[in-house]
């Protein structure tokens, strides 16, 4: 990624994003954050919510697709996943709605379709707590460990050991929470 990452934001080249036949357009790749959106959309479809049909487009992050002008219009942070909903629900008549960051997309889809998120305040808050925990812990652990273990130009013992320990700690949090329950929230 050393050839694509840089210290400033914005597009590096002109390239519009493709648009398919469904209102929901997903722009992503098969990373841990990237697959969250398609997993949720597939779960919504499995529930019989046909309005969750979508088109998925590959963003080749190693080649810098996320820095194309079309992608930057959807997500100014140039990170996957990103989504455009050409038919937002409710009173919104402002045209297509851009949604970025996997957690934000998951919450948007849950709200839009009224599914896969609890409706009572206690369970809903606990659900959002765990979504935020994963959003904050997962990239720190996976991204930090993965970078220093697999991608850093020089292997450094301290960061590898530090992220290994933190990965184990985060998994222990998860194991303890699930020790006597089947699901993160509710049953």
For each of these PLM feature ranges, what is it?
Residues 166-169, 173-177:
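Solvent-exposed, charged/polar functional surfaces in cytosolic regulatory/catalytic domains
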Residues 1-168:
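GST-like domain detector, emphasizing the conserved glutathione-binding G-site
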């Amino acid at each position: 990624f050393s050839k694509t990452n840089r210290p400033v934001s914005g597009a590096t080249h002109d390239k519009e994003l493709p648009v398919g036949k469904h209102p929901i357009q997903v722009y992503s790749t098969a990373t841990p954050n990237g697959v969250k959106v398609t997993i949720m959309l597939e779960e919504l479809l499995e529930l019989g919510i046909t309005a969750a049909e979508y088109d998925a487009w590959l963003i080749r992050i190693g080649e810098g697709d996320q820095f194309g002008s079309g992608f930057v219009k959807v997500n100014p942070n140039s990170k996957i996943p990103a989504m455009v909903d050409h038919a937002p629900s409710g009173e919104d008549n402002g045209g297509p709605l851009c949604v970025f960051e996997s957690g934000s997309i998951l919450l948007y889809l849950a709200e839009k379709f009224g599914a896969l998120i609890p409706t009572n305040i206690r369970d809903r808050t606990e659900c959002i707590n765990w979504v935020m925990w994963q959003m904050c812990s997962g990239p720190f652990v996976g991204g930090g460990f993965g970078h220093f273990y697999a991608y850093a130009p020089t292997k450094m013992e301290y960061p590898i050991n530090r992220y290994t320990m933190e990965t184990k700690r985060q998994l222990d949090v998860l194991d303890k929470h699930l020790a006597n329950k089947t699901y993160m929230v509710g049953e």
